């Protein structure tokens, strides 16, 4: 598209020279005018032929300068740019709207505009500015003796450029505000004709996005002091350090399993072996070491373990009834023996443990759970316990642990166990069973795949009624208690023991002080003895001197001695 502007050569020299209204066309062909045919004309705008003259579209008089056209990417002619760069700028083609009479005022504005174009497309050359008006264009009829001129009203940006003063910050802010997209774009192009003069309000085609406008306002440096909008300082969220509880969840779902009582929680598991009766002395020993206010112990019994306790309890009842019968023989009516059944007696009475020790059996798993929202017992026991000690451990339960079976309460707890807490196993079985290949394979599986499980080495003892001695008996219960204490952090120091240690240290210090005093006294006595000896020696020397003097005074005596 080309726009041709001409002025009448016959007009008065004093008449202000104005820019002709560009003639727009939607066709792809350009109207090329030869330089020779255009003699007498003042300027030709957007001509593709080099060496043409153009008038800067300003509101005041302007002088003609030599221009050079550039070609854009589409092959059509672009905007007319100045060959001579403005002072202080790099040699990059830039569109200028300068007036020589207002050159000093327009220098800073030109640099601001060039910087904004670079900000808009940093990786490409500055796009030429086109003053084309989209939509329908006004066609001016060619009448003779009629001055067809166009008085170009500046856009809001141009109007603000006129009032720009580089020494005032407010003017710079006003320009930046004017260059925003909502103010720089014009929605209509009104054209009015008065006295054969066409006045067109031509908008500029510079389009800026909100992001580019913000970058343009913030990236201008060294030219104009523009106060950019301060960025919001990101609020640093205070990270609250996470407090890791000792257990997974301190919520108490069962009053029999308090999670936040501040005690050590030891869970014993007993299986069907003759060593099951050692559970009572182990519990008693642990309570003596820590005290009831610092340790809480609960016990899980398998079905086989309860059989051992029930049989022993039944035998005791039978013996007591026999004694009653013997005592009642002297009476008229004999006493009837009472044989309790497992359902009639309390399990705590059968096991003969202190009443504060909680016992669990397989039936308790179903008694505690009635509906979907009720807690599951083996999960609650797993949450409650700090350590699990299975003593004694039979070959049956060992196989279940190695294979991952969970068909009772104890194996369900082991299967759902948290690996962060230890499990101690104390095997108790016949020597031939412990030395079998299957047992060795299962122990090897536990050792390799369950690092949180520790298997104690059994002891040698008489294993059966035949008197055979073999390896397979449960470790001595004192050693088991010792290993439990070491897993829990070692033996605690009581206040009494600390007081005794302090008293012993004080006694030792007093003894050392008394010994030092005695040694000092002995040294003083020795010094006194030495002083006495020295005095005696001095007296002897004085006596000898006196004798010598006497002999010197009486020479006759000396002669007699000779």
From Swiss-Prot:
Residues 1-10, 44-63, 99-113, 142-156 have a biased composition (Polar residues). GO terms for molecular function: catalytic activity; FMN binding; identical protein binding; protein serine/threonine phosphatase inhibitor activity. It holds the Pfam family Flavoprotein. GO terms for cellular component: chromatin; CoA-synthesizing protein complex; nucleus; phosphopantothenoylcysteine decarboxylase complex. Keywords: Coenzyme A biosynthesis, Cytoplasm, Nucleus, Phosphoprotein, Protein phosphatase inhibitor. SUPFAM superfamilies: Homo-oligomeric flavin-containing Cys decarboxylases, HFCD (SSF52507). It is found in: Nucleus; Cytoplasm. The modification Phosphoserine is found at residues 47, 50, 54, 56, 155. It comes from the Eukaryota. Belongs to the HFCD (homooligomeric flavin containing Cys decarboxylase) superfamily. Component of the phosphopantothenoylcysteine decarboxylase (PPCDC) involved in the coenzyme A synthesis. Acts as an inhibitory subunit of protein phosphatase PPZ1, which is involved in many cellular processes such as G1-S transition or salt tolerance. Also modulates the expression of the ENA1 ATPase. Present with 3750 molecules/cell in log phase SD medium. This is Phosphopantothenoylcysteine decarboxylase subunit SIS2. It comes from Saccharomyces cerevisiae (strain ATCC 204508 / S288c) (Baker's yeast).
């Amino acid at each position: 598209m080309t726009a041709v502007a001409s002025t009448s050569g016959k007009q008065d020299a004093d008449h202000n020279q104005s820019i002709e209204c560009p003639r727009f066309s939607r066709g792809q062909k350009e109207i090329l005018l030869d330089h020779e045919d255009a003699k007498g004309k003042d300027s030709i705008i957007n001509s593709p032929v080099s060496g043409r003259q153009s008038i800067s579209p300003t509101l005041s008089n302007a002088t003609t300068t030599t221009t050079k056209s550039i070609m854009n990417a589409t092959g059509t002619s672009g905007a007319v740019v100045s060959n001579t760069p403005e002072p202080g700028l790099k040699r990059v083609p830039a569109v200028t709207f300068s007036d020589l009479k207002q050159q000093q005022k327009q220098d800073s504005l030109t640099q601001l505009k060039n910087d904004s174009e670079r900000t808009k497309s940093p990786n490409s050359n500055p796009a030429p500015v086109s003053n084309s008006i989209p939509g329908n264009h006004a066609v001016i009829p060619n009448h003779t003796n009629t001055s067809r001129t166009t008085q170009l009203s500046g856009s809001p940006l141009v109007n603000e450029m006129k009032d720009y003063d580089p020494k005032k910050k407010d003017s710079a802010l006003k320009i930046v505000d004017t260059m925003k997209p909502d103010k720089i774009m014009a929605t209509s192009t009104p054209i009015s004709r008065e006295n054969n003069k066409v006045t067109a309000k031509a908008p500029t085609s510079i389009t800026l996005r909100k992001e580019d406008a913000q970058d343009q306002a913030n990236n201008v440096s060294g030219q104009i002091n523009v106060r950019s909008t301060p960025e919001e300082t990101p609020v640093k969220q205070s990270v609250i350090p996470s407090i890791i509880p000792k257990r997974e969840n301190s919520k108490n779902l069962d009053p029999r399993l308090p999670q936040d009582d501040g005690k050590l929680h030891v869970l014993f598991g007993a299986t069907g072996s003759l060593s099951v009766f050692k559970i009572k002395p182990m519990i008693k020993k642990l309570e003596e070491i820590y005290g009831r206010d610092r340790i809480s112990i609960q016990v899980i019994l398998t079905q086989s373990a309860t059989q051992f306790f029930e049989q022993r309890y039944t035998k005791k009842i039978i013996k007591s009834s026999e004694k009653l019968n013997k005592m009642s023989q002297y009476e008229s009516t004999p006493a009837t023996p009472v044989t309790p059944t497992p359902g009639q007696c309390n399990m705590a009475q059968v096991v003969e443990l202190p009443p504060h020790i909680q016992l669990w059996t397989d039936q308790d798993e179903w008694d505690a759970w009635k509906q979907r929202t009720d807690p599951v017992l083996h999960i609650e026991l797993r949450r409650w316990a700090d350590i699990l000690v299975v003593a004694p451990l039979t070959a049956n339960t060992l196989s279940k642990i190695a294979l991952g079976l969970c068909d009772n309460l104890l194996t369900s707890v082991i299967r759902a166990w948290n690996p962060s807490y230890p499990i101690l196993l104390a095997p108790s079985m016949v020597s031939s069973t412990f030395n079998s290949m299957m047992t060795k394979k299962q122990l090897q599986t536990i050792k390799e795949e369950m690092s949180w499980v520790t298997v104690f080495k059994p002891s040698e003892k008489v294993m059966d009624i035949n008197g055979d001695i073999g390896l397979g008996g449960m470790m001595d219960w004192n050693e088991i208690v010792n290993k439990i204490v070491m897993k829990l952090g070692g033996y605690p120091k009581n206040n009494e023991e600390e007081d005794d240690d302090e008293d012993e240290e004080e006694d030792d210090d007093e003894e050392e002080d008394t010994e030092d005093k005695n040694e000092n006294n002995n040294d003083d006595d020795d010094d006194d003895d030495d002083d006495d000896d020295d005095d005696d020696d001095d007296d002897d020397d004085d006596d000898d001197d006196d004798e010598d003097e006497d002999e010197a005074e009486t020479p006759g005596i000396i002669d007699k001695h000779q």
